[in-house]
């Protein structure tokens, strides 16, 4: 997709409503990568095991691709990891850096850099965990994105990607608006393609990974229906491009009414608020073969401050 879809607007007004999903995805991925330690023989309490797990996390290198305003990157840092968040949009990176100032001294480290999911500015095997929450789904050439995620993740490391499902409410928002512009050309990629396990399997074909997928849900809540509609119609991304085209054709108000009707149909709030459960597909992919899997967390990786802040060519996005 075109990077200018993400210029301006207010992403956080909409995106913050589901940002807590990043906490769940990050916790799940870190637990799969570094399972909680059990008390070793001769150690009497689980406190020692908890400290062992925390120590292991201190050496865990995490890459958040399409970091946006940084919810997943910050969640990983709060868990003690050493994190790099990558995005193409300067405004979102500024928001992420501002929010990183709220990390505690006892948390891990995080750095946010400009970069493209199609050409990540890191050496091979750099990270223990590469994750993306509703980020890489917006990048073009998904097979190339998968290859890049595998390339920068060490053998035995993990890839975790969360993406909206096509049939869920979040996957239906863009089509609900887009249909007022007429049918899209055959073969036009959709961000919700990442919510289809069969497509994911085809993208990873030939790459050294084993993976599983499962559907999870996140409760999305806004103060009211009107707040939700306003948040989405001003949110940067493909929807705003559709809105501009519909306004030019004087059809936006019809599309806006359909968007409001979609939200109302899925509303689960028992007050004046709007709340709905949004399903997403969680992909967990293990890189490399078991024989190559290290038995301990990888150490000796470069510090986040040493990683290059390379601005990739414009024209595609990781978020």
Stretches found by the model and what they are:
Residues 128-142:
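A short SAM/SAH-binding and catalytic strip from SAM-dependent methyltransferases
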Residues 118-129:
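A short acidic, Gly/Pro-enriched loop at the edge of an enzyme's catalytic core
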Residues 3-10, 69, 193-294, 298-319:
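Conserved Class I S-adenosyl-L-methionine
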Residues 61-120, 144:
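Class I SAM-dependent methyltransferase SAM/SAH-binding core
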Residues 143-158:
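A short glycine-rich, Lys/Arg-flanked "PGG" loop and its adjoining helix->strand segment in the class I
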Residues 1-42, 46, 50, 54-57, 160-185, ...:
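Conserved class I S-adenosyl-L-methionine
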């Amino acid at each position: 997709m075109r990077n200018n879809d993400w210029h301006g607007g207010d992403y956080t007004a909409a995106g913050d409503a589901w940002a807590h999903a990043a906490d769940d995805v990050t916790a799940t991925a870190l637990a799969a990568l570094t399972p909680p330690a059990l008390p070793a023989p001769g150690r009497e309490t689980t406190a020692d095991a908890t400290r062992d797990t925390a120590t292991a996390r201190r050496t865990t290198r995490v890459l958040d691709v399409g970091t946006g305003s940084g919810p997943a990157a910050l969640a990983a840092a709060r868990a003690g990891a050493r994190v790099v968040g990558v995005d193409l949009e300067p405004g979102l990176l500024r928001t992420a850096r501002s929010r990183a100032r709220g990390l505690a001294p006892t948390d891990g480290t995080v750095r946010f850099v400009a970069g493209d999911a199609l050409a990540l500015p890191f050496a091979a095997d750099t990270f223990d965990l590469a994750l993306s929450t509703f980020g890489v789904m917006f990048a073009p050439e998904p097979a190339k994105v998968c290859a890049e995620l595998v390339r920068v993740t060490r053998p035995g490391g993990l890839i975790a990607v969360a993406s909206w499902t096509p049939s869920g409410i979040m996957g239906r928002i863009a089509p609900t608006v887009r249909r007022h512009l007429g049918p899209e050309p055959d073969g036009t990629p959709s961000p919700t393609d990442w919510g289809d396990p069969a497509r994911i399997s085809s993208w990873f074909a030939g790459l050294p990974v084993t993976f599983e997928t499962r559907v999870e849900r996140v409760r999305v809540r806004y103060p009211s229906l009107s707040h939700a509609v306003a948040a989405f119609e001003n949110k940067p991304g493909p929807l705003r491009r559709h809105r501009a085209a519909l306004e030019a054709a004087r059809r936006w108000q019809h599309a806006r009414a359909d968007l409001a009707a979609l939200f109302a149909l899925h509303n689960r709030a028992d007050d004046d608020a709007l709340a709905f459960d949004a399903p997403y597909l969680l992909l967990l992919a293990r890189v490399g073969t078991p024989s190559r899997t290290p038995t301990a967390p990888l150490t000796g990786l470069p510090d986040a401050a040493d990683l290059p802040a390379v601005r990739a060519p414009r024209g595609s996005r990781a978020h």
